[in-house]
């Protein structure tokens, strides 16, 4: 990945991932987090696994991020954009929609 692509990816990722590492870590430990999203074979949901990966990325020095990290960041940006566009009507405070986005590091209420 070229430097300009990395910069664009970083900027988009940091613009959409609006939860701090501490907030995301606390959220991922919650029952609401673990029950949100699509679970494969009764295991961890895709979003929850992504949240753990996002936490690792946020805690890594920017210069130490790999191309694989940047690819995951692109995936996160795409997911958040798609799901924000599908916001349900009404109060979303305790919805699976919000909980799923929070697993991906984005709290739509912030």
Language model features by range: what are they?
Residues 2-110:
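A charge-rich, low-complexity, intrinsically flexible signal that marks solvent-exposed coils, linkers
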